[in-house]
């Protein structure tokens, strides 16, 4: 399932083609994905101007000129394909074969861009686990999917001081705390494993046990911010079914230090340990017991 960097990569790929464009019409090829499409989905979007594309945690948000917003989630295998005259100029050249399989094209947005050029934005989802829902004018932040989300782990919003306040008194393992979307929004299994390795912290350690150590909290906050920023710059992890908006595979997976590297040498040159795998709450955790304490 795509994590925050993958969704941000998709947002940035779609942005030049969607922002400022007018929706000419929408082809809706089935009544539902994970959830049913909103009533009159295609009709309500026709003629609307797209003001901005945003992201909250792992959700893509599309803001329209009448105040209506679309909340979209890519699910396990969702992707957007761009068909436009200048689309070939984007990285990847739109050559990913799966994204061109029209059998799973469930929604097609026909757009007229501000420069007069046309574009088609196609949502493809073989597993149909993604979704598109509406948030009415003024109700986006209070939407049930968004209202309880925690702080974003990007920019300067996440600091050691913020982490200390979030972790204080918590007995849950550090990894579980970092995956709690009510505390920090958008972190997933891959990048939590990587951030904990960079910070030198055991994923099994109780979150509250380090809340009072500000140097440790600052180190962890910095590790989270840097791993997310680097993943976004690299185009996301592209594991399994995830692909970018332009159809190209990302390459951050080549930089993984622990994730998926069970039994391989730790990449900390001062360590000499071996990457281990354990299961926490049904998910694989990769870490180095030698340098993560």
Curated annotation (Swiss-Prot):
Zinc finger FPG-type: from-to: 257-293
Membrane-spanning parts: none
CDD domains recorded: EcFpg-like_N
Cofactor annotation remark: Binds 1 zinc ion per subunit.
Catalytic site positions: 2-3, 58, 283
Biological process according to GO: base-excision repair
Subunit structure as annotated in this protein's UniProt entry: Monomer.
Family: Belongs to the FPG family.
Protein name: Formamidopyrimidine-DNA glycosylase
Biological source species: Brucella ovis (strain ATCC 25840 / 63/290 / NCTC 10512)
Gene: mutM
């Amino acid at each position: 399932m795509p994590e925050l960097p993958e969704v941000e990569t998709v947002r940035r790929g779609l942005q030049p083609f969607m922002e400022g464009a007018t929706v000419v019409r929408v082809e809706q090829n089935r009544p539902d994905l994970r959830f049913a499409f909103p009533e009159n989905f295609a009709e309500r979007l026709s003629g609307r101007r797209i003001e901005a594309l945003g992201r909250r945690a792992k959700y893509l948000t599309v803001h329209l000129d009448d105040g209506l917003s679309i909340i979209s989630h890519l699910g396990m295998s969702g992707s957007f394909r761009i068909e436009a005259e200048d689309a070939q100029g984007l990285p990847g050249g739109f050559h990913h074969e799966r994204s061109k399989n029209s059998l799973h094209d469930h929604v097609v947005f026909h757009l007229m861009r501000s420069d007069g050029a046309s574009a088609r934005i196609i949502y493809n989802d073989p597993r149909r686990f993604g979704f598109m829902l509406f948030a009415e004018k003024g109700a986006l932040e209070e939407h049930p999917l968004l209202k309880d989300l925690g702080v974003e782990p990007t920019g300067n919003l996440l600091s050691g001081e913020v982490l200390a306040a979030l972790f204080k008194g918590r007995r849950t393992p550090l990894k579980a705390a970092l995956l709690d979307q009510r505390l920090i929004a958008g972190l997933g299994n891959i990048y939590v494993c990587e951030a904990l390795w960079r910070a030198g912290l055991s994923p099994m350690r109780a979150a509250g046990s380090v809340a009072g150590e500000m140097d440790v909290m600052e180190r962890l906050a910095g590790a989270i911010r840097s791993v997310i920023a680097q993943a976004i710059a690299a185009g996301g992890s592209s594991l399994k079914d995830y692909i970018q908006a332009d159809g190209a595979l990302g390459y951050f997976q080549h930089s993984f230090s622990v994730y998926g590297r069970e039994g391989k040498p730790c990449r900390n040159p001062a360590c000499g340990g071996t990457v281990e795998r354990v299961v926490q709450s049904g998910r694989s955790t990769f870490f180095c017991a030698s340098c993560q304490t």
